[in-house]
Amino acid sequence: MPGIEETIVDTRENVVVAIDRWLKDNKVDRLLAYNAAFDRNHLPELKSYTWCDIMRLAAYRQYNAKIPADVACYGTGRMKRGYGVEPILRMLGEDKHYEETHNAYFDALDELKIVQLLGHEIEVYDNAVIGR
């Protein structure tokens, strides 16, 4: 991450304060996360930011052109199943056998990759804001 040159090992409280400071210093006002409600609920210190749920775009036909025609969707366009990070990355990317490594760092990289592969402008994520 630009401005962070080394691994930070500290208490949760101090790390969250450092993240919040970095976000403010870099004029970040929104956070994108897959299943953002989970992260938002586990990071109450960051509730002042606008949280956008990447899943709200990745799992809907109107935002994800790579959803195959034979995938079952509700009338809203949302997939009925199979819209976790792993299946979405397999759908969008070239690695059809992708397997997640669950930790904060790799989860963030996976989520960034989904955002990049969807290719939407940041304003499109206004449709994915949670907790207004």
Language-model segments: residues:
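Short alpha-helix plus adjacent loop in nuclease-associated cores
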Residues: 52-79
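Acidic, Mg2+-coordinating catalytic module of metal-dependent nucleases/exonucleases
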Residues: 30-33, 42, 73-132
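Short, function-defining helix-loop hinge/capping sites that tune catalysis or transport
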Residues: 43, 47, 61-64, 115
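Conserved non-catalytic scaffold segment of RNase H-like nuclease domains
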Residues: 1-49, 76-79, 85-92
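Acidic active-site catalytic centers that drive phospho-/nucleotidyl reactions
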Residues: 39, 53, 107
